[in-house]
């Protein structure tokens, strides 16, 4: 699984070259998700024909593959639907046959791109093989288009002419597991269906004017009412299986069509609404429209400003300039979002990772803007206010996350324990679900995710919701699954993070969690002075980050002369800084391709050095806090054993001055702040070391090998 993108134009003439370019640009916007192959499907030269182009490797290889066919890129299409995909091999190895899109047969009657895992694909494959279908790949996805064809052919034999979304529903009923998929078909030209269950999909709408967007058909149909009828009437008969009169359809409406006294009146919608027949387009003709579909809303930022998020079990059907959403439940919502294009371009930087490291001065301001008041020493979190009573009477706090988000939770755990005086657990999302942890109604569960779509974290969230715990989301993407399914939350306002390495999201999550701890403990009189100290320190963190970034020339020299020849690193930390060591070690593995291990300082003597060869570089966090004397003692032992540690310490810390002059140690001096925030400053030198080690080794830092933004649910 990896990235999905689709593009549909209706009554807007586009050349084949323009359509291909749009699909390729969409895939390039998803490149920050690690992938190893890509492909697209577009209409062929003949009516009702679909062509597939796919290739292993980077998107540039796909472009070269397409060029080999000498396509007529000037061929115009007044209406067209194309789909595209980047794949990271899960089911089936890395070979061209396993790349998406997948087809139903050599004629490409049905073509599918898919994210997720179909858990019953072996049974489906056996059934379809028995029916005479030939499989060319090792993937679970290939069973989907073949199942489409099998059900379609069977329905035709029985005399049924099913609509595309009805056919899709019959297919989905046979699938077990998770999916986000797009399907096109030669039997339904210029149409596309999208469906999701456990894997995100978002649809962007674009017209020639805002009015066109406000009045595009978005028809919400009740799945049970719709599909159980299995109405065989086609669109040509004028009936689109509507569960309500067409006059109630609205664009991007927050409430479904008015069908009963229990539903909100459509006039409460904050968007313009009305019947498309009551607000005809110019000259009474259908409105020209464009639709963009993606697994990640950030990839739509350059095209649209309004998007619709599909919920689990929803089916979206796009045709004739209309978007019909067949809902599993009432109340599918729409969102407006704004993402400045400058935030998804590299600008003057060589790559996105470098850009995002330097953006931390600004992103740490953004997460605090309007929330931290240094004059009143208060933290205001409007996203949590409605749950104030439940949150402050929590008997236990559980933070659940994966990867770098897990490290940010570990970094914030001590301050939660200190300020809240309740037990605080930090859990890896996958392990949390596997153990069926005990969760109670008076627990507060905090879910932290960079994308808001991390599969394991979403599974943990669903588990906690069933246990009736209060849930908080800390995410960067508004409208993501975690932000919508949690009771309340804090948006980190970090902006798009295109690099695989989590840099600015880590520091923003760290600050967001500290702010939650400050907000939840506001009623504890005994913590007033401690809270004031932290709030005052928060306000100067952005300027202190700027000071830390001034270490870059020293770090470049250090990587060039002392570090790049090593392939093993040890990182030492204790207290708040153990999380910094974990995050730093993770970055070095992920970006620099070196073995790095994070160790509690007092564990160093327990045979760790015995298994490390060639006197590996040791990076120690020794900034001032309650553990400083013990860490200094540990560093002294390393020096005595002929080690040459790299020490991250505070400015003006003179304890290693003599050793520094002798060349025994290298110090990276960072500004001093309160202990619970020091990790924000300390992790940045490790980000820079990871970055420059990779650059010195000619590694592509934005797309390191074998990394993925979200893992499949296996």
From Swiss-Prot:
The keyword Zinc does not apply. Coiled coil: none annotated. GO terms for molecular function: carbohydrate derivative binding; glutamine-fructose-6-phosphate transaminase (isomerizing) activity. PROSITE patterns: GATASE_TYPE_2 (PS51278), SIS (PS51464). Residues 266-285 are annotated as: Disordered. Pathway: Nucleotide-sugar biosynthesis; UDP-N-acetyl-alpha-D-glucosamine biosynthesis; alpha-D-glucosamine 6-phosphate from D-fructose 6-phosphate: step 1/1. It catalyses: D-fructose 6-phosphate + L-glutamine = D-glucosamine 6-phosphate + L-glutamate. Its EC number is 2.6.1.16. Residues 2-321 form the Glutamine amidotransferase type-2 domain. GO terms for biological process: fructose 6-phosphate metabolic process; protein N-linked glycosylation; UDP-N-acetylglucosamine biosynthetic process. The active site is at 2 (nucleophile). Residues 387-526, 559-704 form the SIS domain. Residues 266-280 have a biased composition (Polar residues). Keywords: Aminotransferase, Glutamine amidotransferase, Repeat, Transferase. The keyword Repeat applies. It comes from the Eukaryota. InterPro entries: GATase_2_dom (IPR017932), GFAT_N (IPR047084), GlmS/AgaS_SIS (IPR035466), GlmS/FrlB_SIS (IPR035490), Ntn_hydrolases_N (IPR029055), SIS_dom (IPR001347), SIS_dom_sf (IPR046348). Involved in amino sugar synthesis (formation of chitin, supplies the amino sugars of asparagine-linked oligosaccharides of glycoproteins). This is Putative glutamine--fructose-6-phosphate aminotransferase [isomerizing]. It comes from Saccharomyces cerevisiae (strain YJM789).
């Amino acid at each position: 699984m990896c990235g999905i993108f689709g593009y549909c134009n209706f009554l807007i003439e586009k050349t084949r070259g323009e359509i291909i370019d749009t699909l390729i640009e969409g895939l390039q916007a998803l490149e920050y998700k690690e992938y190893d192959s890509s492909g697209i499907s577009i209409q062929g030269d003949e009516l009702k024909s679909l062509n597939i182009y796919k290739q292993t490797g980077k998107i540039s290889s796909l472009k070269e593959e397409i060029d080999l066919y000498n396509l007529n890129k000037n061929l115009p299409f007044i209406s067209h639907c194309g789909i595209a995909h980047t794949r990271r091999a899960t089911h089936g190895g890395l070979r061209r046959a396993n790349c998406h899109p997948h087809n139903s047969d050599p004629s490409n009657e049905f073509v599918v791109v898919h994210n997720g895992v179909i858990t019953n694909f072996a049974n489906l494959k056996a059934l379809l093989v028995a029916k005479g279908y030939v499989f060319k790949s090792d993937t679970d996805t290939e069973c989907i288009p073949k199942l489409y064809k099998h059900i379609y052919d069977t329905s035709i034999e029985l005399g049924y002419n099913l609509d595309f979304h009805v056919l899709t529903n019959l297919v989905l009923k046979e699938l077990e597991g998770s999916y986000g998929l797009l399907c096109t078909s030669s039997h339904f030209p210029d149409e596309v269906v999208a469906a999701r269950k456990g894997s995100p999909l978002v649809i962007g709408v674009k017209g020639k004017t805002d009015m066109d967007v406000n009045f595009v058909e978005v028809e919400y149909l009740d799945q049970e009412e719709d599909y159980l009828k299995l109405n065989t009437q086609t669109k040509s008969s004028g009936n689109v299986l509507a569960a309500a009169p067409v006059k109630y359809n609205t664009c991007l409406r927050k409430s479904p069509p008015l069908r009963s006294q229990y539903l909100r009146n459509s006039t409460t919608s904050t968007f313009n609404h009305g019947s498309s027949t009551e607000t005809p387009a110019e000259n009474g003709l259908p409105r020209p429209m464009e639709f963009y579909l993606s697994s990640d809303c950030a990839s739509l930022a350059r095209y649209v400003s309004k998007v619709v998020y599909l919920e689990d079990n929803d089916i979206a059907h796009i045709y004739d300039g209309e978007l019909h959403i067949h809902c599993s439940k009432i109340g599918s919502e729409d969102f407006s979002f704004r993402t400045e294009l400058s935030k998804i371009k590299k600008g003057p930087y060589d790559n996105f990772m470098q850009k995002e490291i330097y953006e931390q001065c600004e992103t740490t301001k953004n997460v605090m803007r309007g929330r931290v008041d240094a004059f009143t020493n208060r933290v205001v979190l409007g996203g949590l206010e409605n749950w104030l009573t439940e949150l402050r009477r929590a008997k236990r706090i559980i933070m659940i996350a994966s990867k770098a988000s897990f490290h940010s939770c570990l970094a914030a755990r001590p301050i939660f324990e200190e300020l809240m005086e309740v037990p605080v657990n930090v859990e890896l999302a996958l392990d949390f679900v596997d153990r069926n942890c005990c969760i109670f109604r008076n627990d507060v569960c905090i879910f932290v995710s960079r994308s808001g779509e991390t599969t394991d974290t979403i599974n943990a969230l669903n588990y906690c919701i069933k246990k009736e715990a209060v849930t908080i989301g800390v995410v960067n993407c508004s409208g993501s699954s975690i932000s919508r399914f949690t009771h309340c939350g804090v948006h980190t306002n970090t902006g798009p993070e295109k690099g695989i390495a989590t840099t600015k999201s880590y520091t923003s999550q760290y600050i967001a969690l500290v702010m939650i701890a400050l907000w939840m403990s506001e009623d504890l009189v005994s913590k007033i002075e401690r809270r004031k100290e932290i709030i005052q320190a928060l306000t100067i963190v952005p300027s202190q980050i700027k000071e830390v970034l001034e270490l870059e020339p020293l770090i470049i020299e250090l990587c060039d002369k002392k570090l790049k020849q090593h392939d093993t690193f040890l990182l030492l930390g204790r207290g708040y800084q153990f999380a910094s060591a974990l995050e730093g070690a993770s970055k070095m593995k992920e970006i620099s391709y070196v073995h790095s291990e994070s160790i509690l300082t007092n564990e160093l003597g327990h045979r760790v050095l015995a298994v490390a060869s060639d006197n590996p570089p040791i990076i120690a966090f020794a900034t001032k806090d309650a553990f400083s004397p013990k860490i200094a003692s540990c560093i002294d032992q390393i020096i005595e054993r002929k080690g040459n540690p790299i020490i991250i310490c505070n400015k003006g810390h003179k304890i290693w001055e003599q050793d520094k002059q002798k060349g025994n140690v290298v110090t990276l001096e960072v500004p001093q702040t309160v202990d619970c925030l020091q990790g924000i400053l300390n992790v940045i030198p490790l980000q820079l070391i990871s970055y420059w080690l990779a650059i010195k080794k000619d590694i592509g830092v934005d797309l390191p090998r074998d990394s993925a933004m979200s893992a499949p649910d296996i």
